[in-house]
Amino acid sequence: MPGQRRSGAKAGRTGRWAALAFALAAASFASCRGAEGGAAPATGGGGEGGEPIEKKPPAPIQYGEGKRIAHLANGAIDESSGLAASRCNPGVFWTHNDSGGRPRLYAFNRKGESLGVFDVRAGAIDWEDMAAVKIKETSYLLAADVGDNFSLRGQYALYWLEEPEVAEEEKPAVPRRLDAEAIPFVYEDGSHNCEAAAVDPATGAIYLVSKRKAATCKVYTLPGPLAEGWPEDGYTAGEPARAVAVATLRIPTVTAMDISPDGRRALVGTYADAYEYARAEDETWPEAFGREGRRLAMPARRKGEGISYGPDGRAIYLTSEYAPCPLFEVPVLENKADGKDE
């Protein structure tokens, strides 16, 4: 696939990430590596005497009315298509532009202030979404080059990279360079337009939701670099990954997706409202997507294609494909039955 690049050695995942770490150090900036953490694996289990544990999703969060809280100061962000809350830089968000833009990530804070520009060594046919995830002790970003309005592309690409540290102020203003692991892939059932991608922190699996004007859409999954099933030497354009359909959702025109930092909730966004799915501790996401999503009213916005849980995994943030780019917040009603896990 044009523009795809693979970082690191070809002697296995360990060698590739060692090479990537060296490249990051040579570029004089650090990635976000911290203490052991992340979501617990989604596995089956039992109570005393081996009795199965009841599948009980977390209680619903009560959200308040969404409103615009800022405009993004960086005027280059004129088609914010993906949005993600940092897993290691407190109060930092990430976004990127839609098709026609460079493979570039923008960092900003809740006030809309620019905190840096980062060029990714990757291809960029039509970036449509991104995700942030913390797996064990390291935070990662995923950029999804998956747009295909006319379903003509034979192959698509995801770009996986360690999340860099971001300063509280934008310096230097010159874009910094980031290496990325390319994940070329195909769908098991042909070409699809897609604008929604997320990563499960419990398993490292990547989820994609197709964009259709019909009443339904499909959820697909494929392994990420840290997931079970990832080949030792990764994937290539000649041997791409295969995205497999695992669920059908009764939602038209899906434009965005996110999975909460604890791996228990998923948002599926549209140009209007969003739908929230909750996963019990012993459930898989395909099982959780088998239930109806909870419809959430989102603030009115023009061409809203970015959605993300906040850093705490509770409040919801949104952007729009217009300049100056607005930042919306849907807060949590703390004095209500706020949905804390039991």
Question: Where is each model-derived feature located?
Answer:
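Bacterial N-terminal signal peptides that target proteins for export
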Residues: 3-19
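Compositionally biased, intrinsically disordered low-complexity segments
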Residues: 1-3, 14, 25, 42
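Sequence/structural signature of beta-propeller domains
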Residues: 32-342
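Serine residues within intrinsically disordered or low-complexity segments
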Residues: 7, 28-31
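Bacterial N-terminal signal peptides
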Residues: 18-28
